[in-house]
Amino acid sequence: MASTTPITMEDLQKALEAQSRALRAELAAGASQPRRPRPPRQRDSSTSGDDSGRDSGGPRRRRGNRGRGQRKDWSRAPPPPEERQEGRSQTPAPKPSRAPPQQPQPPRMQTGRGGSAPRPELGPPTNPFQAAVARGLRPPLHDPDTEAPTEACVTSWLWSEGEGAVFYRVDLHFTNLGTPPLDEDGRWDPALMYNPCGPEPPAHVVRAYNQPAGDVRGVWGKGERTYAEQDFRVGGTRWHRLLRMPVRGLDGDSAPLPPHTTERIETRSARHPWRIRFGAPQAFLAGLLLAAVAVGTARAGLQPRVDMAAPPTPPQPPRAHGQHYGHHHHQLPFLGHDGHHGGTLRVGQHHRNASDVLPGHWLQGGWGCYNLSDWHQGTHVCHTKHMDFWCVEHDRPPPATPTPLTTAANSITAATPATAPAPCHAGLNDSCGGFLSGCGPMRLRHGADTRCGRLICGLSTTAQYPPTRFGCAMRWGLPPWELVVLTARPEDGWTCRGVPAHPGTRCPELVSPMGRATCSPASALWLATANALSLDHALAAFVLLVPWVLIFMVCRRACRRRGAAAALTAVVLQGYNPPAYGEEAFTYLCTAPGCATQTPVPVRLAGVRFESKIVDGGCFAPWDLEATGACICEIPTDVSCEGLGAWVPTAPCARIWNGTQRACTFWAVNAYSSGGYAQLASYFNPGGSYYKQYHPTACEVEPAFGHSDAACWGFPTDTVMSVFALASYVQHPHKTVRVKFHTETRTVWQLSVAGVSCDVTTEHPFCNTPHGQLEVQVPPDPGDMVEYIMNYTGNQQSRWGLGSPNCHGPDWASPVCQRHSPDCSRLVGATPERPRLRLVDADDPLLRTAPGPGEVWVTPVIGSQARKCGLHIRAGPYGHATVEMPEWIHAHTTSDPWHPPGPLGLKFKTVRPVTLPRALAPPRNVRVTGCYQCGTPALVEGLAPGGGNCHLTVNGEDVGAFPPGKFVTAALLNTPPPYQVSCGGESDRASARVIDPAAQSFTGVVYGTHTTAVSETRQTWAEWAAAHWWQLTLGAICALPLAGLLACCAKCLYYLRGAIAPR
C-alpha cells in the first residue's frame, strides 16, 4: 500500500527519475520481442526506436482541451497541407547532437507531426507555437497496443502579491499521462511538463509556474485531492503556487491515498501536516436556526407590556355628526400607511378609514382623484389646530364638460371646470345650507389664484389620530431592549422622562395616565420562539443571515494557514467588546473658532480648515481702463505726450498711448484767436482737418462751442482754452491674478473634547474619547471652488468663487474660463472696444447720472489762480471688458469661502451614567414670531443662560436643549400669548408677535382644491406613476450603481473561488 506521508517536490523528482529508468528498461526488453507491423512514426530522441511504427491517427490519439470550452486546440498541431492532400508523412530529421552548455539551453527536437522545430530559447513556452513544440514529446507509460486511459485535466492556481487579489488558473494534463523527455545528463526538463489543456495563461504566469522551488510551505487536502503550497520569488515579485499532487503512488502501487476525513484546528501540528476540509454545512444550519430565532425575537417577539393595574383609558371626546354623501370610495394605491391619517373618520352614521376619505398628510401631499359630493361642490383639505378637516366649497356651478385632473405630489394646482368660476362672497353671513359647522373664508396657498371671498363650509368630520402602538428594539440582538413608539396619539399623554413621546422615540420606559409601558423579554420569550417559526419571519431570517454565513465561510476557507482558525476564533469571540453607553446628551456648538460648550465634557472648536485637490489654472493680467488729460489755457501746437509734458504726467501718458484701442480727443473751447492772430471757427472743422495741417497731432480735434471757458478766469472773452483727454485699455504692471481650482473640497472641523484633539468631517463625523463617543452633525461640504489670488501693488489677497463656472453659459467670458499662462503675461478675453471720450460742462445736468459702459467724461475745473485750470475725469463701466476686470472678480466672489448656515449638533454618548448640568435661570430676550394652532412652526429665538444646557419650555411644552448663548429654533405653538419660557427653573415672559386664528373658522393651510371632474375616486397605477415620476427616476438611477456593485461582488466571488476551493 502507498504511504500516507504527503509527497513533496523532492519526492516527485525522484519518482519521475525512477519512472524514466523503468521506461527505458521496459523499452529495451521489448525490443527483442516480435511486434505487429505498423506504419512508421517519427519518434523523439529520448525514446526507443522500436516504437517508430506507432499509428498517430488511431483511437489513442491525445485529446486536448476536453470540456474546457476553448476555441483553439494547442495540444495538437495540424498536419501540413501536403500531408493532408497526399496522405504521407515526412522523413524524420537527423537527431542533432547537444553539447552541455554553461547555461542549459533546450535542444532542437521533433514535434511528432513531421519535421522538426527549435525548442524555446527563452525557457518555458510562452506562446502557442512553443507550447505545441513542448507538447509533442509525450511517450506513453503503458503498452502502445492497448488503449490509453481517459485523459484528465487538473487545475493549479497561482497568485502574486504584486498584482493584488488576481488568481491565475492553469489547467494541464497530469504527469502520469506521459513521461517527460530526458536530457543527456539523465535529468528531466521541467519546462516540458507544462502541458496545458485549457486557455493559455500570460507569459509571466507561465514563467512563474515553471519556476523551480524546493520548499513546500504546506500540504492541503480536500476529499481525495492533495495540493502542495509553495511561495517563491520571480524577478523580485513574490508568487504563491498551489500544485495538484498525484492521487496514486508513483512507486507502481495503485492504491489511492486515504481520504482526508479528520480536521485538525490546533495551532501546532505534531507529525502530520495540518489538513482542512473546506465546507461548513453544520455551522450554516445551526447559524440559520439561531438567526431565525433572533430575527423573530427582534421583529415581533418582544411585545411591549402595559401595566394593567393603571387607570383605564380616558373616554374619547364626542364627535359631531356631519352630512353624509353616499358615494363609494376606493382606497388609493399609495395610501393606508401608518402615519398621521392611519385612524378612523366618522361621517354621519358610518365609520370609514382615513385612507379612504382623507388624502395624504398636509406636509407630504400625494393625494389623487376623489370626490365626496356631486358636481356642485369642490373638495378641499383644511389643516388647522394640528388636524386635517374635510371641507366642501358650496354653491359652485357645475362644469360644462368634465376635465381630467392632473395630480402630482405636493401640488396644489388642480383642474378647473370649463365654466366661469363662482362669484365671490362678500361677507360671512351666507348660509352653508344644511352643514352643521361654521363657515369661513378660504385662504389658498397658491398666489396666482385670484378667486377671493368664497365660503368653505366644513363638515363636522374630525380626523382621529391613530391609536398608540409600541415596538421593541435591541442592539446586536442582546439586552437591554428599548421601547420604540410607532404611532402616538397626543391625548394618550405618553411621556419619556417628562418629554412627550413622538413616533420614533426610543425609551426604556414610557409613562402616561394609562400606566407604564416597557418591553419585558421574559413574558414574550415563548411568543418570540413561536413567531420565529412562521413563514415570514423564517424568510426574513434567511435573507438577513445568508450574507453573514457566506462571510464566515469565506473567512474560514481563505484562512488556511496553520493556526488561522484558532486565531480567528480568538478574535471573534474574545476581541469583541459590545458598546455600553450610560447616557446621551445633545447640544449645539457655534461655528466660530474658539466656541465652547458642555455636553457633559467641555467641547471647544479649535479651528476649521479645508482640504481639497488643487489644479493650477494659470495666471493672467487683468485689463485696466486708464485715462488722463490736461486743461490748458491756450491751444498747443504739439498735441502729444511729448508736447504736453508740462501738463500731462509722462509715465501714465506713455502707458495709455501704447495701450489697446486708444481714444484721444482734443477740444478747443471758444477758439477765436491764438498767438496774436485771429482764426475762424472753420479752422477746426470738419474734424480738425485744417488744424492738423499746421499742427501735428494724432488725436481727434473738435471745437467745443457753448462750453464755458471760466476755468481760465481773468481774461477777455476772446481768450481760448483747450482740453486734451487720452484713454485706453492697458495691462496694469502691478496687477496679476492667479487661478486655482479646488475639487473634492471637504471641511475639517478641529475639535477639542476634554483636552483630546479630534478632527471630524462629513465622511467621519465621530470622535472616540475616553469619556465616550461624540457624534457631530456637520454641515455638507461646500463642493468645488475657484480661488483667485490677486496681487495688486504688492498687496496679495484671495477671493473665492463657489461652484464650478458655467463656461458654456453666461460665464464664457469670465477669467476662470480662459486659458492663462504661468508667467502672468497674458491678458484675458477679447480686445475691449474703444473708449468714448465726452466733454461735459461743470453745470451740465448729465453729471447727475453715471457714465455709460466704456465712456469717459471730462469736465474742466476752475483753477486756484489765473491761467490755471484742472480736469475732472469720470470713467464708466468697462463695457465689453467688464468680466476681465478686477471689479468683476470682486462682484462674483467672496472673501469668506464658505460659512455654515447654522451651529454644529453634538450628540455625546457617555460610557457611564453622568448627571448632565442643567441651567435653572430663565432665558433672556426670547422672541416668538409666527402663529399658533395653524400647523406651521413659529420662530423662537433668544439667549440661553450659563450653568449648563437650557431645556427650553414654552408654556410648559418642551422645545429643545440649547447650550449657553444665542439660540434660534422653530416650534409648533398650541397656546395663545402670553408665553412663559423657562429652562427648568424660574420662568420669564417672552415677547410675541403671533397671528390670532380665533376670528376665522378655517385658517392656516388650505390646499388641494379639487373639482368634480371625475366620476369616481379610483386612481390608476399609471396616474400614480405620473405623479411620482421623480421618485421612480431616482430609484432607477440608484438601481444602476447597485446593479454594478452586485456585478462587481459576483465577479469578485467568481475569481475568489480559486483561493477558497481550488479544483
Swiss-Prot record:
GO biological process: clathrin-dependent endocytosis of virus by host cell; fusion of virus membrane with host endosome membrane; virion attachment to host cell
Post-translational modification: Structural polyprotein: Specific enzymatic cleavages in vivo yield mature proteins. Two signal peptidase-mediated cleavages within the polyprotein produce the structural proteins capsid, E2, and E1. The E2 signal peptide remains attached to the C-terminus of the capsid protein after cleavage by the signal peptidase. Another signal peptide at E2 C-terminus directs E1 to the ER, with a similar mechanism.
Pfam families: Rubella_Capsid, Rubella_E1, Rubella_E2
Keyword Transport: no
GO CC aspect terms: host cell Golgi membrane; host cell mitochondrion; membrane; T=4 icosahedral viral capsid; viral envelope; viral nucleocapsid; virion membrane
Glycosylation sites: N353, N371, N429, N658, N791, T1011, T1012
GO molecular function: metal ion binding; RNA binding
Region span, Functions as E2 signal peptide: 279-300
Positions of region (Functions as E1 signal peptide): 563-582
Free-text comment about domains: Structural polyprotein: Contains two internal signal peptides that are necessary for directing translocation of the glycoproteins into the lumen of the endoplasmic reticulum.
Protein name (record): Structural polyprotein
